Structures are given as structure tokens and as C-alpha cells.
Amino acid sequence: MTQEREKAIELALSQIEKQFGKGAIMRLGADEALPDIDAIPTGALSLDIALGVGGVPRGRVIEIYGPESSGKTTLALHIAAEAQKLGGIAAFVDAEHALDIGYARKLGVRTDDLLVSQPDTGEQALEIAEMLVRSGAVDVLVIDSVAALVPKAEIEGEMGDSHVGLQARLMSQALRKLTGIISKSNCCVIFINQIRMKIGVMFGSPETTTGGNALKFYASVRLDIRKIATLKQGDAVIGSRTKVKVVKNKVAPPFREVEFDIYYGEGISRLGDLLDLAVDRKIIDKSGAWFSYGSDRIGQGRENSRNFLKEHPEMVAEIEDKIYETAGIPRKGGKEEAA
């Protein structure tokens, strides 16, 4: 670069910084330019690995969507619990007015410290979300759900009135305002979304998410969560086998799929997930129905092996270390054993 051009660019940079403040523009090579992506664990180690950065990225918009009772809120509450374990503040905008505090507590959420809002309208919910993000003190904010963000005009109108595109416009405007401040505040904003069917679709998937297309564009990570099997103990249903597909990922390669168990009243089975991962990575040997780690026999059958690991946290920590090492992702926080 010639000296004149160098001087011209330096002058332009100084004018931009003078007018818009320090940090408005910077060279990518500078230390303070773009920090490494920090993440909050999801509560499922396999999903942390699939996301490529050890969890859901901070300072980004995340969308979790799927059919009813597929585990969307469970996953979001696990992320909130993990943020609290790391010393952060979690907030929950309960637009559906359906948050089960007892269940959240069972998943590890410190409910006494959880900030909860139950707004009357979609506008109120998104304004509260904006104020919380602007504070710069909230680490994770969950909005449950986009479908329940009903515009004020629809609430105040008659039951049969048509309000075409109102919610989509509301979401589009809110995300335009929110994206910049979310990035600056390093807050992870999670939108839970529902699925609807498009009428008359002949080819391709007829499924679509509510609230228009804006969220699809603004989200850095989109997770499609589905129940694929029922877990039983005898005749009693005790949980569900769940599959999560990373449909979109701006921070790592997308389209990875993982499976884990969600138990009723317990949430994601961290130890079951750990067992599956360790077998896949040849850290634990599976011969017939027997699971063994090194020279130690863990148990016969998956459930017995899971119970053995629950009683041996030092072995769990050792296996976790090996999984993190082979996956090449950083460990967040301390070595905590979770069922």
C-alpha cells in the first residue's frame, strides 16, 4: 500500500472513531477485534460437540423449534441452568404462561435467582427482552415461545378479526433492533418456536415455523428437536429418546445430528449421553450387553451402567476429560457430575 493511501485510511479511521467512538471500526488482526466465540453448555455433551464450540454461542440469536412435547423448553431450561452454574444470570420470558417452576428446579435451575416475566402482549415481551439485553448483565434470555408473542392489536380485537402478517412484522422489527445489542452485550437469546403445516405443499416438507422468516435469517444457530422413541420401564413410560439436528450454524459446520434421552422429572440424561459418546469414541467397550471401562466392568445393560456411573463421579470426570480431548472443544466451568 502506498504512503498516501495509508495516510488516507488512517485519517478515515480516526474520523470514524471520533464520530462514532472507539471500536466502531478496527483491523481484524488487532487483539481486541473479534474475540474467540464463548459458549454456554446445553446440558447434553453430544450436542455441545455437534455445535462445534462447546455449546450455544454467546452474543447470538438461537432458535429451538419442534413439534409439541419434543423437549424444546427442557433444552432451554438446561441451558439456563448451565449459565447459572458458570455464575451467570438467566432470564425467562414466559409468553405461554406455562413455566413449571418445580420442573425447572429438578433440571438444576436455581429458581430463586431466575428472572421470570409473563407479559400480556408480544410488544411487551420483546420490549422487556430488549431492556434485559441492554442491561448487559443477563447471560441467557429464553423467550417461550414465538407463537405466543401475540400482537396487541390482535389481543384487543374481536375473535374473528383477520390480522395478516402482524406477528411477522413484529418479529422482523424486534430482531432488527435486538441483533446489534445482543452481540455487544454477549447475551445468548433463545427463541423457542412451534411448527405449523403449510397448506397445499406437494413437494418438500410442508412444515414451517411461526413468526415469519426474520428469525430464520437472524438466528446464528437453529436446532430442530424431535421425539423419536418412547422410553419404558416395564409398562410405565419414563421418558423419550430425542433427536436434535443442527439445521443452521454460523459458528461451525451445520447439519450434525445427535440423540439423547430425556427422562420425565429429570430432564436430559447426561450420564446416558456420556455413555453413548464414550462407546462411539471407543473410550468405553461394549461387548454384548456388557459395558467396560479399561479393566473395570461398569454393568450389564445401559440402565445398570448409567446407575454405576452415577455412583462413581471420579470415573465420569475421567471419561469426560477423554471425550473433550478427542472432540477438541473447550470444557466450560468445573467438573460437575449430573445425572
Curated annotation (Swiss-Prot):
One of the GO biological process terms: DNA recombination
Listed InterPro entries: AAA+_ATPase, DNA_recomb/repair_RecA, DNA_recomb/repair_RecA_CS, P-loop_NTPase, RecA-like_C, RecA-like_N, RecA_ATP-bd, RecA_C_sf
Recorded superkingdom: Bacteria
GO cellular component, one term: cytosol
Residues involved in ATP binding: 66-73
UniProt feature coiled coil, ranges: none
Subcellular location(s) per record: Cytoplasm
Name of a matching Pfam family: RecA
Keyword check for Hydrolase: no
Molecular function terms from GO: ATP binding; ATP hydrolysis activity; ATP-dependent DNA damage sensor activity; damaged DNA binding; single-stranded DNA binding
Keywords: ATP-binding, Cytoplasm, DNA damage, DNA recombination, DNA repair, DNA-binding, Nucleotide-binding, SOS response
Keyword DNA damage set for record: yes
Family membership noted in the UniProt record: Belongs to the RecA family.
Function noted in UniProt: Can catalyze the hydrolysis of ATP in the presence of single-stranded DNA, the ATP-dependent uptake of single-stranded DNA by duplex DNA, and the ATP-dependent hybridization of homologous single-stranded DNAs. It interacts with LexA causing its activation and leading to its autocatalytic cleavage.
Protein name as annotated: Protein RecA
Lineage: Bacteria, Pseudomonadati, Thermodesulfobacteriota, Desulfuromonadia, Geobacterales
